Amino acid sequence: YMPIHVKVVTAEEYSKWVESEKKILAAKADDPTKVWTQNDLIARGEKVYAANCAACHQANGKGAGPIKPVDGSAVVLDADKSKMIAVMLNGQNNGAMPAWKQLSDTEIAAVMTYAKNSWSNKTGQLVQPADIKTARK
């Protein structure tokens, strides 16, 4: 026989509990030790780019005016991903390119992989969330 414990809570308490459970599930899904495939990173990165980067760098990666392009960028094309990671985490040009530390390790790895493999950037390179986690230390 298994005893059942029922806890009665208010609708507000229940909503808070549901939100906390969603955050726990999201954190597990974004486990920085998970090794992602290139296709999965690119698909996720496309969404991150559209939500956070396209406003300045344009959907086509070409940039506009003083905003530098991502398409064909030496930093993006460089096999040394530490340079692009530093830009993503710290920003550059006195804040013209903002830091994106608030994004998860998975989101940063995904958007970097997307940028490295979109438009004319066909590097075949990928960045794993563990790379971002290490760089944050």
What is the predicted role of each segment?
Residues 1-2, 21:
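Terminal connector regions
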Residues 2-10, 58-103:
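Gly/Gly-Pro-rich "capping" loops immediately C-terminal to redox-active cysteine motifs
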Residues 11-42, 46-47, 51, 98-137:
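Flexible coil segments in periplasmic/lumen-exposed cytochrome c-class electron-transfer proteins
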Residues 31-60, 64-66, 70-74, 79:
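Flexible, glycine-rich surface segments
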